[in-house]
């Protein structure tokens, strides 16, 4: 409470966002519009692993749950998602749900040309978006 009051004394401050410090496996979901195919949805490990491992799975929107699970299971890093060496896996159902919901959103928000949600922090209980980037093109 003291720190909140102190921060609110700063003239330019109009509000403060407070969120819990979370831990988990970093995941990634994204999308890119391709002229010939429509929206391509991507998933994989997130954070720096997207660039380092280049282990990404893709599918054409809209996606079914079966297709989302297939994307997840086809990743080379799937053992990390499943849980390995004593580490618990992530909630695959929630990860698949996010992939499906993103693909559904793209059917209706056609102005979205690129989208990255990276990282998603995932545990066996939750999958929560930490950061996102969206590029929109209006016609």
What are the residue ranges of the model-derived segments?
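ATP-dependent carboxylate/acyl-activation modules
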Residues: 1-139
